[in-house]
């Protein structure tokens, strides 16, 4: 079995492409089924394995397969599933085989490949991806072991290095940007759209600035109300957004919607109602919640996850010593995992040897039972049984020795000596 990771992320593709390749949560299980069966060889000797990790910053397919053409098949499947031409998608896709796939998984879970260096959210997202793949019946020995090692490495990296210390989060970056637009956040009305983890983090950072008003709009009113109460704010129905958008100076959105929930026309009307006072908007969703054209309006300052990334990277440079330490840990653990993977490669051979040997044994035992049933001498039957087993078991090694020459034969001879040097001696030879 070969490990392979196919994906795009914030390093290789802009948000405009990432949002088109993202998988809504409810689509991941059925997508895994088609991905496994169509492109990872359903009739291969070993059952293929797969997991899909889809976040704001990355979409990745983790595979274990015997299919040597899995790379091309996975890219083609991703293209067809999302209806994106291969020529448009392929230049942004990375394909990581074997140890590169292992190293990548370890780095992602440890926060080394994140826009926010050392952030912990990705670890939870990866665990969610594994849980979903397990529920879909898409995981097996190889990916299960990979992800368990991945989580252990992430824990080791975070526990022994300062990789997560003093990190500038996306939420903190949003506050910094707002402070560039407005003299003080405390005079502004802030609206958060959504009630997930990212909105909760953003609300925490903005609430620390004591805004004039803090409002949560969410599809599920009860969840929005609970979050609003935590920050002494209030909730409003998401359906009120078009008519009340003009009330807010700062709007932060991060929902799981597959289509934009804020369009150009709605924002144009809000700007007009505000008499062209500026609106600061942050779209942390992938796919995006706010139509990109909104950013072209004169009095609107619209930022996406990629825009916030520049601010985040300013805080990453100071922690390069921790990065080097983390990379050393990861490299050691990659080698350990590859050693385990190497041992797995002989398992099918050993299993086949056991099957063949057992078939020989059963055939000879059946012959012996027939001879005993017709009254043959038991001692003679046992002698014939042992001779037949001996001849058949050494037939393979003997044939191999006769087929090779030169250095190959010498190596095989040494190997055979090792096999048989500890063979038990008969009682008369041992003197007992």
Curated annotation (Swiss-Prot):
Function of the protein: Catalyzes the NADPH-dependent reduction of glutamyl-tRNA(Glu) to glutamate 1-semialdehyde (GSA).
Family listed: Belongs to the glutamyl-tRNA reductase family.
Self-association state and partner proteins as the record states: Homodimer.
UniProtKB keywords: NADP, Oxidoreductase, Porphyrin biosynthesis
Site residues (Important for activity), renumbered to this chain: 104
Pathway where this protein functions: Porphyrin-containing compound metabolism; protoporphyrin-IX biosynthesis; 5-aminolevulinate from L-glutamyl-tRNA(Glu): step 1/2
Reactions listed under catalytic activity: (S)-4-amino-5-oxopentanoate + tRNA(Glu) + NADP(+) = L-glutamyl-tRNA(Glu) + NADPH + H(+)
Assigned EC number: 1.2.1.70
UniProt organism field: Burkholderia ambifaria (strain MC40-6)
Class in the EC hierarchy, top level: oxidoreductase
Gene: hemA
Name the UniProt record assigns to this protein: Glutamyl-tRNA reductase
Classification via NCBIfam families: hemA
Molecular function GO labels: glutamyl-tRNA reductase activity; NADP binding
Other notes: During catalysis, the active site Cys acts as a nucleophile attacking the alpha-carbonyl group of tRNA-bound glutamate with the formation of a thioester intermediate between enzyme and glutamate, and the concomitant release of tRNA(Glu). The thioester intermediate is finally reduced by direct hydride transfer from NADPH, to form the product GSA.
Residues the record lists as binding NADP(+): 194-199
Gene Ontology biological-process entries: protoporphyrinogen IX biosynthetic process from glutamate
Annotated positions binding substrate: 55-58, 114, 119-121, 125
């Amino acid at each position: 079995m070969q490990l392979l990771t196919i994906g795009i992320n914030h390093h290789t593709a802009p948000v405009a492409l990432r949002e088109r390749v993202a998988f809504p949560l409810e689509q991941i299980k059925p997508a895994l089924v088609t991905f496994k069966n169509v492109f990872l060889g359903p009739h291969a000797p070993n059952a293929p394995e797969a997991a899909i990790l889809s976040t704001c910053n990355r979409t990745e397919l983790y595979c274990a397969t015997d299919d040597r053409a899995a790379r091309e098949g996975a890219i083609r499947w991703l293209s067809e599933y999302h209806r994106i031409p291969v020529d448009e998608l392929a230049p942004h896709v990375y394909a990581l085989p074997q140890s590169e796939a292992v190293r990548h998984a370890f780095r992602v879970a440890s926060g080394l490949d994140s826009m926010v260096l050392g952030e912990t959210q990705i670890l939870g997202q990866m665990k969610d991806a594994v849980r979903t793949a397990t529920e879909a019946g898409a995981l097996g020995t190889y990916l299960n072991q990979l992800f368990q090692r991945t989580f252990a490495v992430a824990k080791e990296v975070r526990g022994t290095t300062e990789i997560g210390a003093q990190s500038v989060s996306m939420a903190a970056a949003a506050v910094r940007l707002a402070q560039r637009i407005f003299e003080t956040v405390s005079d502004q009305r802030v609206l958060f759209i959504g009630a997930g983890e990212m909105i909760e983090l953003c609300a925490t950072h903005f609430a620390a600035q004591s805004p004039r008003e803090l409002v949560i709009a969410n599809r599920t009113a009860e969840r929005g109300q609970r979050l609003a109460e935590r920050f002494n704010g209030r909730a409003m129905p998401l359906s009120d957004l078009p008519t009340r958008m003009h009330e807010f100076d700062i709007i932060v959105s991060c929902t799981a919607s597959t289509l934009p929930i804020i369009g150009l026309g709605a924002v144009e009307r809000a700007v007009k109602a505000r008499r062209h006072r500026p609106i600061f908007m942050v779209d942390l969703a992938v796919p995006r919640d706010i139509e990109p054209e909104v950013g072209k309006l004169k009095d609107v300052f619209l930022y996406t996850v990629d825009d916030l990334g520049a601010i985040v990277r300013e805080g990453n440079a100071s922690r390069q010593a921790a990065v080097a330490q983390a990379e050393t840990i990861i490299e050691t653990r990659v080698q350990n995992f590859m050693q385990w993977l190497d041992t797995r490669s002989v398992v099918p051979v050993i299993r086949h040897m056991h099957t063949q040997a057992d078939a020989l044994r059963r055939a000879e035992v059946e012959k012996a039972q027939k001879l005993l049933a017709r009254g043959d001498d038991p001692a003679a039957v046992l002698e014939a049984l042992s001779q037949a087993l001996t001849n058949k078991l050494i037939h393979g090694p003997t044939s191999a020795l006769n087929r090779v020459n030169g250095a190959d034969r010498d190596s095989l001879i040494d190997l055979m000596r090792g096999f048989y040097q500890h063979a038990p001696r008969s009682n008369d030879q041992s003197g007992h």
